[in-house]
Curated annotation (Swiss-Prot):
Family under the similarity heading: Belongs to the PPR family. P subfamily.
Record flagged with keyword Mitochondrion: yes
Keyword Mitochondrion appears in the UniProt entry: yes
Protein name per UniProt: Pentatricopeptide repeat-containing protein At1g63070, mitochondrial
Pfam families per UniProt: PPR, PPR_1, PPR_2
Subcellular location per the Swiss-Prot or TrEMBL entry: Mitochondrion
InterPro entries, per the entry: Pentatricopeptide_rpt, PPR/CCM1_RNA-binding, TPR-like_helical_dom_sf
PPR repeats: 74-108, 109-143, 144-178, 179-213, 214-248, 249-283, 284-318, 319-353, 355-389, 390-424, 425-459, 460-494, 495-529, 530-564
Source taxon at top rank: Eukaryota
GO cellular component: mitochondrion
Transit peptide extent on chain: 1-34
Record keywords: Mitochondrion, Repeat, Transit peptide
Length: 590
């Protein structure tokens, strides 16, 4: 069988040229040891302890002395040295030394041939690996399972997966017992080549042939199936595996439960969870994590809380990642009471204290639901526990205060952030500018903006758009336009929001021609207009009483797949009521 594989390669080994000159300082001790050395001296110098501490230069020097000694050390001694060099990943040197041995008439054995085969497989030079296998077998050496595993790995990495499968089948036919390395190597290769069904078939075929894969092999196949989104096949394989008297462990159950939860097979996941407990397999944190997360995703908050309580009663302590993910899930759904309870559980457990991420999540939740003072309380508690807030912490609070129209406290938090040595990033500054502008503090925003420019901060388009809008709303449309025109010089490209903001400024000032010109420029050279752009211009034309221009814009907007927004509908409805518009406008928008 192996002869049919090995016959592929018949070429001689490529000649490697390596200068065997070690560093005189590092090899001196070896040279002294082998001055007039016998093969017994070699054996002593190749003890396990010496080889463990061997450096490359010393190994080269030692080889030089070994080939000078008479009689030559045995091939076993040479094998030990070559193996030590191979462990240094110096395979080119191993090949070169092997060639020198051959030229000196030192015959290789099974072990050295296996090293060479492993080298060529790692280098994806399979034809040379097969040539050595053929030569080895011609000399009467049958390959070991280690050698065949090297060849198998070479086939898998060399995109010759069908030959890898055939090799394993032939191994079984010839009486070899594939080990864990054999199976896992082939399984990983099959999954890398999107051959999941063949991986399952391989396991089933091996069982029929009386070559039972072990738990590790089943685990590799099940893991691969779940990663590919086929947890139902993994579940079937688990059932077959257990019928074959191979008991799955908690890792395999966790893998399938996680896969079932990810792909929304929640009932199957809980059935498996119950089966697991019935069989006496104790669940751990990795069992509960996907189940609780899945319940949260389906909005089954009370069930999630019950399962969490069950977990804690069993003294299964969630890790920080689990707690943080769960707190985040509660916060996103507005379940702040549940999030606080979970936080309290973290503190009580004493196994897992809240970190900055947990505090930031809670603060974000309070700020999102306009409870920024409670967010500040969490921040103070965090500081009392010795944790220092990061950029996200302060930025979240600043944003929260601005949303609550509390401009003074927002600025106070910003000042505290700077005094605490936490560096604001561009997002912090953008939120500060936006908050100041929206609260009527444009002059303060301009001071901050000027400071940012003087510090050579890398301002983004959000920064510039915010300031253009603020200037336009403050009646400084010319200054807004100057800033817009400077963007190209700054290497910043305006986006659709920037164009729309500038057009809105022109329209607010009654500069209809400038708005039209910018709209034309936008369609020719800039980003494509969006719904906001069209609705901004339509409302401006309606306010000017230009029904014809409004109608044309509505038609163009609809042809681009956009519709009127709430503000435009509101304006049209009001104008219909007081008789300034015909009902046809409403029909055009709908």
């Amino acid at each position: 069988m192996m002869r049919s594989v090995a016959v592929i390669g018949k070429k001689c080994l490529h000649r490697h040229t390596v200068l065997l000159k070690g560093n005189p300082r590092t090899t001196l001790c070896w040279e002294r040891s082998f001055a007039g050395a016998s093969s017994d001296d070699c054996r002593e110098n190749l003890s396990r302890k010496v080889l463990q501490d061997l450096k490359l230069d010393d190994a080269i020097g030692l080889f030089g002395d070994m080939v000078k000694s008479r009689p030559f050390p045995s091939i076993v001694e040479f094998s030990k040295l070559l193996s030590a060099i191979a462990k240094m990943n110096k395979f080119d040197l191993v090949i070169s030394l092997g060639e020198q041995m051959q030229n000196l008439g030192i015959s290789h054995n099974l072990y050295t041939y296996s090293i060479f085969i492993n080298y060529f497989c790692r280098r994806s030079q399979l034809s040379l690996a097969l040539a050595i296998l053929g030569k080895m077998m011609k000399l009467g050496y049958g390959p070991s399972i280690v050698t065949l595993n090297s060849l198998l790995n070479g086939f898998c990495h060399g995109n010759r997966i069908s030959e890898a499968v055939a090799l394993v089948d032939q191994m079984v036919e010839m009486g070899y017992q594939p080990d864990t390395v054999t199976f896992t190597t082939l399984v990983h290769g099959l999954f890398q080549h999107n051959k999941a069904s063949e991986a399952v078939a391989l396991v089933e075929r091996m069982v029929v042939k009386g070559c039972q894969p072990d738990l590790v092999t089943y685990g590799a196949v099940i893991n691969g199936l779940c990663k590919r989104g086929e947890p139902d096949l993994a579940l079937n394989l688990l059932n077959k595996m257990e019928k074959g008297k191979i008991e799955a462990d908690v890792v395999i159950y966790n893998t399938i439960i996680d896969g079932l939860c990810k792909y929304k097979h929640m009932d199957d996941a809980f059935d498996l969870f119950n089966k697991m407990e019935t069989k006496g397999i104790k669940p751990d944190v990795f069992t509960y994590n996907p189940l609780i997360s899945c319940l949260c995703n389906y909005g089954r908050w009370s069930d999630a809380s019950r399962l969490l309580s069950d977990m804690l009663e069993k003294n299964i302590n969630p890790d920080l990642v689990f707690f943080n993910a769960l707190i985040d899930a509660f916060v996103k759904e507005g379940k702040l009471v549940e999030a606080e309870k979970l936080y309290d559980e973290m503190v009580k457990s004493k196994h897992c204290f809240p970190d900055v991420v947990a505090y930031n999540t809670l603060i974000k939740g309070f700020c999102k639901y306009k409870r920024v003072e409670e967010g500040m309380e969490v921040f103070r508690e965090m500081s009392q526990r010795g944790l220092v807030g990061n950029t996200v912490t302060y930025t979240t609070l600043i944003h929260g205060f601005f949303q609550a129209r509390d401009c003074d406290n927002a600025q106070m938090v910003f000042k505290q952030m700077v005094s605490d040595g936490v560096h604001p990033d561009i997002m912090t500054y953008n939120i500060l500018l936006d908050g100041l502008c929206n609260n009527g503090n444009v002059e303060t925003a301009l001071v901050v903006f000027e400071y940012m420019q003087k510090r050579d901060m890398k301002l983004d388009i959000v920064t510039y758009t915010t300031m253009i809008e603020a200037l336009c709303k403050a009646g400084k449309v010319e200054d807004g336009w100057d800033l817009f025109c400077s963007l190209s010089l700054k290497g910043v490209k305006p986006n659709v929001v920037t164009y729309t903001t500038m057009m809105s400024g022109f329209c607010r000032k009654g500069l209809k021609e400038e708005a039209d010109a910018l709209f034309v420029e936008m369609k020719e050279d800039g980003p494509l207009p969006n719904s906001g752009t069209y609705n901004t211009l339509i409302r401006a034309r309606l306010r000017d009483g230009d029904e014809a221009a409004s109608a044309e814009l509505i038609k163009e907007m609809r042809s681009c797949g956009f519709a009127g927004d709430a503000s435009t509908f509101g304006l049209v409805t009001n104008m219909l009521h007081d008789g300034r518009l015909d009902k046809s406008f409403l029909d055009m928008l709908s």
